[in-house]
Curated annotation (Swiss-Prot):
Domain of life (superkingdom): Eukaryota
Primary location: cytoplasm
GO biological process, one term: negative regulation of translational elongation
Taxon lineage: Eukaryota, Metazoa, Ecdysozoa, Arthropoda, Hexapoda
Gene3D superfamilies cross-referenced by the UniProt entry: Signal recognition particle alu RNA binding heterodimer, srp9/1
SUPFAM superfamilies: Signal recognition particle alu RNA binding heterodimer, SRP9/14 (SSF54762)
Keyword list, A-Z: Cytoplasm, Ribonucleoprotein, RNA-binding, Signal recognition particle
Entry GO CC: signal recognition particle, endoplasmic reticulum targeting
GO molecular function, a single term: 7S RNA binding
Protein name per Swiss-Prot or TrEMBL: Signal recognition particle 9 kDa protein
Function in brief: Component of the signal recognition particle (SRP) complex, a ribonucleoprotein complex that mediates the cotranslational targeting of secretory and membrane proteins to the endoplasmic reticulum (ER). SRP9 together with Srp14 and the Alu portion of the SRP RNA, constitutes the elongation arrest domain of SRP. The complex of Srp9 and Srp14 is required for SRP RNA binding.
Subcellular location(s) of the protein: Cytoplasm
Amino acid sequence: MVFVKNWDDFEIAVENMYLANPQNCRLTMKYAHSKGHILLKMTDNVKCVQYKAENMPDLRKIEKITSNLVGHMASKE
């Protein structure tokens, strides 16, 4: 498991991982109230990337990446 510090790197890694193997990829989100952060984890059963979101602007980024993945799932490519 690799924690990615930069959002842009995480977003690129998630999209590339999904496009390479869409059948085995999954994105999970876990909210830790006591720590005040959201942990995002994308895995394809071979490799795993994680990102820790700790502030409000990151929520918009999470919404954007989720909609991008849903768009890929809905497209016929």
